[in-house]
């Protein structure tokens, strides 16, 4: 699990954010699935979702997707493969 600062890249623009991410190794497909919340991020409120993004944490970058916006203005993010935070 990771809870801290990150850079969210959307449409070639970087946005500072706070993320709370967790994940698991899926026994069916054998891949690591990670997901979580993005907050404190000044994304365009008219951004169409789902939206491809990259999430960078301390030099590690992973591709993911913003899947929805919550009623509180945060965004859900999900990805498959190596997460942007250390697993261990």
Segment roles from a protein language model:
Residues 10-12, 23-27, 40-42, 59, ...:
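Beta-strand elements of well-folded, non-transmembrane domains
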Residues 54-88:
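Short, compact, well-ordered microdomains
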Residues 1-29:
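Solvent-exposed edge beta-strands and adjacent loop segments
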Residues 29, 45-48, 65, 87:
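Short acidic, gly/pro-rich beta-turn/loop elements at beta-sheet edges
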Residues 4-10, 49-59:
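Short conserved beta-strand and strand-loop elements enriched in small hydrophobics
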Residues 30-44:
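Charged, amphipathic alpha-helical segments
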Residues 25-33, 67-74:
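Short, ordered beta-strand-loop transition motifs
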């Amino acid at each position: 699990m990771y809870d801290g600062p990150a850079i969210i890249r959307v449409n070639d623009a970087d946005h500072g954010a706070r993320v709370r991410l967790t994940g698991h190794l899926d026994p069916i497909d054998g891949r690591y699935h990670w997901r979580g919340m993005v907050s404190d991020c000044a994304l365009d409120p008219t951004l169409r979702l789902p939206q491809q993004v990259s999430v960078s944490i301390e030099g590690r970058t992973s591709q993911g997707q913003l899947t929805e916006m919550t009623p509180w203005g945060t965004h859900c993010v999900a990805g498959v493969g190596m997460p942007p935070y250390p697993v261990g």
